[in-house]
Swiss-Prot record:
Signal peptide: none annotated. Belongs to the UPF0251 family. HAMAP family: UPF0251. InterPro entries: RNA_pol_sigma_r3/r4-like (IPR013324), UPF0251 (IPR002852), WH-like_DNA-bd_sf (IPR036388). This is UPF0251 protein NT01CX_1491.
């Protein structure tokens, strides 16, 4: 029996999720489904330029799992481009919030949501907050603290 899939962490959810060649009717086009974690793998590796280990750490998966995800993603995109198929970005096994922050004023510990990127404490409103993990897990806030 196969193990259940662990949720992969993603930091980006695209606003545009459907791409198709111009001049083809939607009802007559083959569609390839690109899962959100596959898009995230390509974004981290190809756009942010991270190495495999850094990508795997950000997505909270092993290096081998990351490699499997990105291989699948690149194959799907290549197939869509060469066959003239549509790309539908949706679904997957992912989560968007895992990073814990702590307010230095009231001691509140809370999760941030990457989509909202909370920079102030939800309890007292203080902006005197820090990332508990600090190991690249919450890149948005940690990066701002290091500037």
């Amino acid at each position: 029996m196969a193990r259940p899939k662990k949720c992969r962490r993603i930091e980006f959810i695209p606003k545009n999720t459907y791409f198709m060649p111009i001049g083809k009717k939607r009802c007559k086009i083959e569609e390839i489904k690109l899962r959100l974690e596959e898009l995230e793998a390509m974004r981290l590796k190809d756009i942010e330029g991270l190495n495999q280990e850094e990508c795997a750490e950000r997505m909270q998966v092993s290096r081998q799992t990351f490699q499997n995800i990105i291989d699948s993603a690149r194959k799907k995109v290549a197939l869509a481009l060469t066959k003239g198929s549509a790309i539908n970005i949706s679904g997957g096994d992912y989560t968007t919030h895992h990073c814990k922050f702590k307010c230095l004023d009231c001691e509140e510990v809370y999760n941030i949501n990457y989509e909202q990127d909370r920079q102030k404490c939800p309890s007292c409103g203080s902006q005197n907050v820090i990332c508990i993990k600090k190991m690249g897990s919450c890149n948005k806030k940690c990066h701002k603290d290091n500037d």
